[in-house]
């Protein structure tokens, strides 16, 4: 794969700015961190729906963002049971939309049932998977975010310089097997060092955790690539120079963070 130095520079600058914003939010926590999470959720939902609806169905987007914000804010306020009610309310609204429009076909040729499914998929994909960001400790958030960042960065730079074998051409023609291996190695090394310095578990436990985080991060990346492939777009948006959209940047985190949150409940890595 050819190396584009201009893209590398844009990608690096954007990455540093994003890292600074995230670090500041993690240091201040409280309402600042919640505001950043809500912003990511809103932009991510907007991009997700744009993949399928273009610039249409604005009321549905606003409704989904409001429900997603409710889920995240209530979880942040330690009212998880109430947060799940927002997800249930989303299903009821989607079901009502289908009930009253079940025999209609919209201008894009999308049946009402498919539109309702897209609405629910957006709620489950973004705000639901972002919930751990509202309650994980700063140490844990830094760990999982940095592990995913190392995975993505290693995959990009190894893939662009040494990638010759396609990983899954039908899903993502630009991803290489070499990049996937580089991503795995980089993530495992980072997790092992981070765990040895700040963790409670053994180094090999963190190495295994690094394998799991990387596996889910790559699955999240491939899932979002498949979504874009299905609707024939390259990026979810052009909001972030060198990176694409919010979903292009957060796709790996959306899969890796919930997995880590569940595993940490059982094995107490920190």
Model-identified regions with their sequence ranges:
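Membrane-embedded alpha-helical bundles of polytopic integral membrane proteins
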Residues: 2-211
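Hydrophobic alpha-helical transmembrane segments of integral membrane proteins
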Residues: 123-124, 128, 237, 254-255
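Short helical (or helix-break) motifs at transmembrane helix termini and adjacent helical loops
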Residues: 150-161, 217-229
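Membrane-embedded alpha-helical segments of transport systems
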Residues: 154, 181, 247-255
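Interfacial loop-to-transmembrane junctions
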Residues: 230-253
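Hydrophobic alpha-helical transmembrane segments of membrane transport and translocation systems
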Residues: 254, 258, 262-263
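Juxtamembrane boundary at the C-terminal end of a transmembrane helix
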Residues: 262-270
């Amino acid at each position: 794969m050819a190396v584009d130095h201009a893209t590398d520079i844009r990608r690096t600058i954007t990455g540093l700015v994003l890292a600074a914003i995230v670090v500041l939010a993690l240091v201040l926590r409280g309402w600042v961190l919640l505001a950043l999470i809500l912003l990511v959720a809103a932009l991510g939902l907007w991009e997700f729906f744009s993949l399928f609806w273009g610039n249409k169905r604005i009321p549905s987007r606003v409704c989904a963002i409001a429900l997603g914000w409710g889920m995240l804010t209530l979880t942040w306020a330690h009212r998880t049971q109430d947060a799940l009610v927002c997800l249930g309310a989303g299903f009821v609204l989607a079901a009502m939309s289908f009930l009253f429009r079940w025999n209609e076909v919209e201008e894009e040729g999308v049946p009402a049932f498919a539109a309702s499914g897209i609405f629910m998929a957006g709620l489950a994909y973004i705000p639901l998977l972002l919930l751990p960001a509202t309650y994980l400790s700063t140490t844990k958030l830094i760990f999982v975010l940095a592990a995913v960042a190392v995975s993505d960065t290693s995959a990009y730079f190894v893939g662009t310089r040494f990638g010759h074998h396609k990983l899954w051409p039908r899903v993502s023609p630009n991803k290489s097997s070499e990049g996937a291996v580089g991503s795995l190695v980089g993530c495992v090394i980072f997790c092992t060092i981070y765990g040895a310095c700040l963790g409670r578990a053994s180094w090999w436990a963190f190495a295994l955790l690094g394998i799991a985080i990387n596996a889910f991060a790559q699955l999240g990346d491939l899932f979002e690539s498949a979504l874009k492939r299905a609707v024939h777009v390259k990026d979810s948006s052009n909001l972030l120079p060198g990176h694409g959209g919010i979903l292009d940047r957060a796709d790996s985190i959306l899969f890796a963070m919930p997995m880590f949150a569940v595993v940490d409940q059982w094995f107490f890595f920190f």
